[in-house]
Amino acid sequence: MSQWFQLGLQNGNSPLMEQLIFFHDHALLVVILITSLVGFFLAALFSNKFLHRYLLDGQAIETVWTVIPAIILVAIALPSIRLLYLIDEIHNPALTIKVTGHQWYWSYEYSDLNDIQFDSYMIPSNELSTGMYRLLDVDNRSQCPMIKAIRLMITSDAVLHSWAVPSLGIKMDADPGRLNQSSLLVNMPGVFYGQCSEICGSGHSFMPIVIEAVGESDFLKWLELQIS
């Protein structure tokens, strides 16, 4: 989860988020280099006393400032396209979780496993225990096994929502009457927090998301408790 005065991205806890962080750093480096180069040329332009009033054209320099930006754009576009395909790629998922946005809470359905369903509401501030996070903790956490490919089916029964967990690299719109699909694979055990990322009404700020990634044996025990 994010920390106070944090300026960077959250630590990546899924292969997808790790790739997104790498691409962010790659693109940011290119932007910094371009900004520095343009700033240098602007400073040089305003500080020198030479005039070029009689320079009508320059084929060489025009070729350079056309070809080099094209190469830079391709260097940014290729990893971006690769990431877009990785986000959509879901191959033989071990589990499918259906997420439905309501006004204003989330419900989860494990239809592969005896049709387990439950609602997840934010815990009010006056009911929080020590160690809980205000506006982030819920009464029912969604559990999933770590290091397993999971398919998420996300929709809404009312207004537009967006199911987002930044540290897992997931942000998917929940649209009424439509199923959107995303993939999830968690690297390590832990509790990961997110929130609705689409302004959806008066309860928008009170729709937290909590994903708890556990080992396979612990996940099976949790399933037994849900079934019983």
Curated annotation (Swiss-Prot):
Query: Which residues of this UniProt protein bind Cu cation A2?
Result: C196, E198, C200, H204
Q: Which domain of life is it from?
A: Eukaryota
UniProt entry tagged with the keyword tRNA processing = no
Q: Name one GO biological process term.
A: ATP synthesis coupled electron transport
Q: Which residues bind Mg(2+) per the record?
A: E198
Q: Which PROSITE patterns match?
A: COX2, COX2_CUA, COX2_TM
Q: Where does the UniProt entry say this protein principally localizes? A: mitochondrion
Can you tell me where the transmembrane regions are? Answer: 27-48, 63-82
The answer, when asked if Nucleus is one of the entry's keywords, is no
Q: Which Pfam families match?
A: COX2, COX2_TM
Task: Read off the CDD domains from this record.
Answer: CcO_II_C (cd13912)
Principal EC category: translocase
Cofactor section: Cu cation
Question: Which keywords does UniProt give here?
Answer: Copper, Electron transport, Magnesium, Membrane, Metal-binding, Mitochondrion, Mitochondrion inner membrane, Respiratory chain, Translocase, Transmembrane, Transmembrane helix, Transport
Q: What is its EC number?
A: 7.1.1.9
> According to its UniProt entry, what is the function of this protein?
Component of the cytochrome c oxidase, the last enzyme in the mitochondrial electron transport chain which drives oxidative phosphorylation. The respiratory chain contains 3 multisubunit complexes succinate dehydrogenase (complex II, CII), ubiquinol-cytochrome c oxidoreductase (cytochrome b-c1 complex, complex III, CIII) and cytochrome c oxidase (complex IV, CIV), that cooperate to transfer electrons derived from NADH and succinate to molecular oxygen, creating an electrochemical gradient over the inner membrane that drives transmembrane transport and the ATP synthase.
Family of the protein in this entry:
Belongs to the cytochrome c oxidase subunit 2 family.
- Tell me what this protein is called: Cytochrome c oxidase subunit 2
Organism of origin is Artemia franciscana (Brine shrimp)
